[in-house]
Design a protein with these regions (language model features):
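Rhodanese-like catalytic fold shared by cysteine-dependent sulfurtransferases
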Residues: 1-20, 28-63, 68-104
Length: 104
């Protein structure tokens, strides 16, 4: 499975109603500065994956994002994949998604 998903692919999944668990894993300080995310996605602390990983459904694909699709998303994606989840992160992160789909 690919590690990344494009903003176009994600928008298509959301519009089609595909089963996906979307996670906002921005650093706490980034989230607190600007809490608006993609489709009212719940925020999960990227520094505390062990505290919330057990709450995720294994049957759904997990798509996560940080601000720019960098080290935060990549680190969390790896932890989820290593635990057996189908996980990808948004290429370019929240910034890219908001540019591609500004009304989301």
């Amino acid at each position: 499975m690919e590690k990344t998903i494009t903003t176009t692919e994600l928008a298509g999944m959301l519009q089609a109603g595909n089963p996906v668990t979307l996670l906002d894993v921005r650093r706490k300080e980034d989230y607190e500065k600007s809490p608006a995310g993609i489709a009212d996605t719940p925020w999960h602390d990227p520094s505390a994956v062990a505290e919330w990983i057990h709450t995720l459904p294994k049957q759904d694909e997990v798509v996560l994002y940080c601000v720019r699709g960098g080290s935060v998303s990549q680190s969390v994606q790896k932890q989820l994949a290593d635990a057996g989840f189908k996980a990808r992160y948004v290429e370019g992160g929240l910034e890219a998604y908001q540019k591609a789909a500004p009304n989301s």
